[in-house]
Amino acid sequence: MDHTDNELQGTNSSGSLGGLDVRRRIPIKLISKQASKVKPAPRTQRTVSRMPAKAPQGDEEGFDYNEEQRYDCKGGELFGNQRRFPGHLFWDFKINILGEKDDTPVHFCDKCGLPIKVYGRMIPCKHVFCYDCAILHEKKGDKMCPGCSDPVQRIEQCTRGSLFMCSIVQGCKRTYLSQRDLQAHINHRHMRAGKPVTRASLENVHPPIAPPPTDIPDRFIMPPDKHHMSHIPPKQHIMMPPPPLQHVPHEHYNQPHEDIRAPPAELSMAPPPPRSVSQETFRISTRKHSNLITVPIQDDSSSGAREPPPPAPAPAHHHPEYQGQPVVSHPHHIMPPQQHYAPPPPPPPPISHPMPHPPQAAGTPHLVYSQAPPPPMTSAPPPITPPPGHIIAQMPPYMNHPPPGPPPPQHGGPPVTAPPPHHYNPNSLPQFTEDQGTLSPPFTQPGGMSPGIWPAPRGPPPPPRMQGPPSQTPLPGPHHPDQTRYRPYYQ
């Protein structure tokens, strides 16, 4: 009964008294049990929620870090790991490359280290990065170049192969749109400013190379005529006149030559070289005088100054002795007639020989002796009286130096009163003037030889005879027994 009572009491109490209590207790218990059972879960949830709560912070921090890493490593740890071990991932296996080699250089970004396909070029500092790094840094870096910290005005987008990067100096890395601009940058920034010693050495090396032409160099590329006029001309201008002057005696002796008159003016402008002053001066003056004497078309003022005045009639007693005798006039005037009948010999070298004999040269100071023949003479009767200063190399000794006094007549001919050569007056000589004419074509001689067929001289004529004049030897006439003895002089 106790048990039943207890049960009833329990039921009653539970029903009457404890109903509310039970109702109250059950939810409490249930709540407590649920709380006790659920508390660990919320704790775990809290811990989990705390972890995720921290995780987003970590994600945010990691996002920031990844952004920085993306700036530095292009996409965080994954790209960083690939960047750290590129050889193990790509270059360990053998590959077979097909296609042609691309010579376009590939540059790597200094921020992410990856090859650049599209450049982001900073203006005005001209440094390049990959376009993503350039844009990202422009947003974060307050428009400052990460390479040089210079302000960036704008960013150009360039494709691979369109830029030329300076690699002469480590750390320069400026880019240019053409090879010419890159070379100008190298010359301006690195060759001049960065290497003064090298520039000095180059300046020392270049000047000797520059005067020639290639090299050279822009200051050496000048017109050749200006160079010849300024540097080499003295010798060339002096050497140029002889060819036309040498040809004048053979071909153009009757024509006025502009190039004959021009070289003296040229020579007056250009100073001759010191080693050949005397030789060149004598040669040119000789040619000038001979041309002016023998070519009557020259200017009258200059020819009149140098030609002897018209001669006075010579004494009559000169004619009988010299008329039939082989007339030996200026040896240079004997040779030219052969040029009408035989091919001209090569002219000897134009070396002047001023005569050392003052008595011979004193009579005709206006003539200088040269081995080269002057232009040939044209038709006129031959001169009769030989000029004293011109009887040089091809005459016998006694004709080179006429006796000072009149020789004794031996064969009935009138005496020849020939004064000494230094007393000859050019005014009294019938000597190669425009009025009287010049040498004629060949004339006969007692020996049967004519000047037209005389052999051409092969070399310089023999030096002038230095013997003293024979005092009593008469001048030979056509009937002189010793005339044949002197024939070798003319053959």
From Swiss-Prot:
Post-translational modification: Phosphorylated on tyrosine residues.
Free-text note on domains in this protein's UniProt record: The HYB domain forms a phosphotyrosine-binding pocket upon dimerization, and mediates as well the recognition of its flanking acidic amino acids.
Record-listed E.C. numbers: 2.3.2.27
UniProt modified residues of type Phosphoserine: 201, 285, 290
Stretches with biased composition (Polar residues): 427-442
Function: E3 ubiquitin-protein ligase that mediates ubiquitination of several tyrosine-phosphorylated Src substrates, including CDH1, CTTN and DOK1. Targets CDH1 for endocytosis and degradation. Associated component of the WMM complex, a complex that mediates N6-methyladenosine (m6A) methylation of RNAs, a modification that plays a role in the efficiency of mRNA splicing and RNA processing. Its function in the WMM complex is unknown.
Taxonomic superkingdom: Eukaryota
Origin species: Mus musculus (Mouse)
Cystine crosslinks: none
Alphabetically ordered keywords of this record: Cytoplasm, Developmental protein, Metal-binding, Nucleus, Phosphoprotein, Transferase, Ubl conjugation pathway, Zinc, Zinc-finger
UniProt cross-references to PANTHER family, sorted A to Z: E3 UBIQUITIN-PROTEIN LIGASE HAKAI (PTHR13480:SF0), E3 UBIQUITIN-PROTEIN LIGASE HAKAI-RELATED (PTHR13480)
Compositionally skewed regions (Pro residues) per UniProt: 342-359, 372-389, 399-423, 457-478
Pfam families linked to this entry: zf_Hakai (PF18408)
Gene: Cbll1
Localization, UniProt: Nucleus speckle; Nucleus, Nucleoplasm; Cytoplasm
Name of this protein: E3 ubiquitin-protein ligase Hakai
Region (Disordered): 1-20, 33-61, 255-491
A Gene Ontology molecular function term of the record: identical protein binding
